[in-house]
Structures are given as C-alpha cells and as structure tokens.
Amino acid sequence: MSQAKLKVRLLSMTPEALAVIYAAFRQCYSPGYVGDLWPKLVGGQVDPAEQALFVADVMESGHLSPVEHVSFTFAVEGVSRALTHQLVRHRLASYSQQSQRYVNESGFEYVLPPQIAKIPEARKLFEEFMDRTAETYGRLRELLQDHGRKGAKANEDARFVLPQAAESKIVLTMNCRSLLHFFALRCCERAQWEIRAMAKEMLAICLKRLPVVFQHAGARCIGLGYCPEGERFTCGRYPLQSTSFQSGE
C-alpha cells in the first residue's frame, strides 16, 4: 500500500473552442446566419484576437450561456472517495468513475490528509488503520470467494469496509459555464483542501487553453473584489462585502 498522488490530465476539449463561442455570441446579436460565417472563422479570416476581445466584452456584461457550447474532459487520479463524493454533486457534468465492484481493491492506495501527516502519532494511527483495512478487505474477498462469490461478486460486498481515503480515478466532462461555477466554489479557501487542489490544477489547464473565458475564473472574491463569505468564514484575502461597500470600493 502507498499514498496516492494527485494527477490531472486534459483528455479533450471542443475543437475550435474560441470560434464556437464567438459564433454563438454573434448569433445572439446578429440578424444573419453564423453558419455562413463559420468557414471564415476556421479559415483564419477573422482575427482570433478580435474574436477574443468580443467574447470578453460580452462576458463582462454577464451574458454567459454561449460558453456552454464548449466543454473540457479531464482524467483525474490520486483522489479520495471523499473528494469524488463532493465532485459528483456538481450536477451539470458527466462522470465515469473507477468501480470498486469491478476493480479488485486489494492493496489500495490512499490519500493522507496533510494535517494528519504533520502529527507523527496521528499519521501512525492512520496508516495502521489503512493496513488493517486492506487486510480485512482481502480476507473478506477470500471468504466470499470460498463461498461461491467470485470476481465482482466478491468485490461488491468486500468494498463495504473500504474507507473514504481509498484512492479513486475518474473522468469528468464539464462545459465552460459549469467550470466557472465549479472554480468559484472549489478554488475558495473555504473549500475542502483536496478538491481545492484539484480545482486549481484544472483551472491552470483551462486558463492555458482558453484564457479569454477563464482569465477571471477562480474563487468568487476574485471577480467580485470582496469576500462574500461573511466574517465567520473569510480568509482575509479580500475585504468583506460590507467593508468594501462602506469604503466605496
């Protein structure tokens, strides 16, 4: 058994992403048919810088629905089941997660929380529990197999003892608007540390591939200029909403 390490890889994104978003925005405000404009967009006859400027200006007004036409697909590994339980609550997305029924989890990797890792006694207790859990899981599989439950049938019952720390792998697809919402929530310091780390890696990829859409993405305070979380939960990076308004910012 060993500790898992977070890895995020972009598998694919909508081809001609900027042109798709530009065309969608143009269709909203143009009496013409953007299908006729498309060959010029993909043929380089409309300057990408001009497209990006137009998209940025319209997004600034709060019109975001056209960015939904572009999506990103990521492969993620080295995350815990605790993380994926949070992740799949973002409903406007598609997920394909490694199955604990069809995959034998003997010797499973696990995610060790940093705050536990800092305390020697806590780390020892945690790692010993992981070892005991792996032994129990393996023994349960053996007993189930001895009583006629083979392969996935043994896995599906033995998995009930697996912890939330157990490492998982998942493929997810989100459109740009869903990603903007995801980053607003999960890049915030209030977000759980593990999903925040994953969100920041995803954002770095999105920002590199489609900067015009994601240039202001991240925790909500970045776009707002103030912290909307209230005095109890603020991290102090930005002034509170009431403070910001009182100062006229």
Please annotate each region the language model reported.
Residues M1-E249:
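Family-specific signature for flavin-dependent thymidylate synthase
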